[in-house]
Design a protein with these regions (language model features):
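Enriched for short, Lys/Arg-rich terminal
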Residues: 27, 72-76, 80-107
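Basic, Lys/Arg-enriched alpha-helical interface segments
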Residues: 1-63, 107
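Basic/aromatic recognition patch in beta-strand/loop cores that engages polyanionic ligands
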Residues: 50-84
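Basic side chains
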Residues: 39, 53, 68-69, 90, ...
């Protein structure tokens, strides 16, 4: 079984920090915030093996770029697979217009 290095971009880390802050501070639920953060972080770390088990985006140009999406609760982890490396680019709230958010950030 091939193992991949999982690289999390600064932008994805900022997304995770923002989701933690939103739940902990704005929703006043710090325990829930930590639980959600930990579930996402744990799921991201599983991308070190078989990262292609999650589907590609259906829309373009993300599909052609090889951008995958992994759903964790109400959040979507966006990532690309290169030889030996999985790069997590975004962690987005699933209820948002995902295609538009990715387009705004990367194009």
């Amino acid at each position: 079984m091939d193992k991949y290095i999982v690289d999390i971009t600064d932008e994805a880390l900022a997304d995770m920090d923002a989701l933690y802050q939103h739940i902990a501070v704005e929703l006043k639920a710090p325990e829930n915030a930590m639980g959600q953060y930990n579930r996402i972080a744990k799921a991201i770390l599983t991308l070190d093996s078989f990262p292609d088990r999650y589907g590609l985006f259906e829309c373009e140009p993300e599909h052609s770029m090889g951008m995958h999406k992994m759903v964790i609760d109400n959040y979507i982890v966006c990532y690309v697979i290169d030889p030996g490396v999985v790069t997590v680019t975004d962690v987005l709230y699933g209820a948002s217009d995902l295609h538009k958010r990715v387009q705004d950030r990367h194009f």
